[in-house]
Design a protein with these regions (language model features):
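Membrane-associated alpha-helical segments
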Residues: 2-93
Length: 93
């Protein structure tokens, strides 16, 4: 996003705005997918009685859930940053 920000500073054309829109759209899809994965991981952890899981498997699932939550947070942060950049540049244009 830093390179894109520099490009926007140099030339405020529609091309850069559409690039931002594409990035924002991708982040929405990415966040939605991560949230769906979180639900699946949580269900796997709850249904460990039906699935034979060893302690290492349970630990691995917990680690995966933590990483997934961090990825959701990062995607949401970048989405907010992109929204702010788009609002700023649209008000300038």
């Amino acid at each position: 996003t830093i390179d894109l920000e520099h490009q926007l500073n140099q030339s405020m054309k529609n091309k850069e705005i559409f690039t931002l829109l594409g990035l924002e759209k991708s982040l929405v899809y990415f966040t939605t997918s991560l949230k769906a994965n979180k639900i699946v991981i949580q269900k796997l952890m709850r249904n460990s009685t039906f699935l034979k899981m060893y302690e290492d498997d349970q630990d691995l699932l917990e680690d995966v859930l933590i990483e997934n939550k961090q990825a959701i947070e990062m995607a949401e942060i970048y989405s907010h940053i992109l929204s702010g950049m788009m609002n700023t540049f649209s008000s300038v244009i």
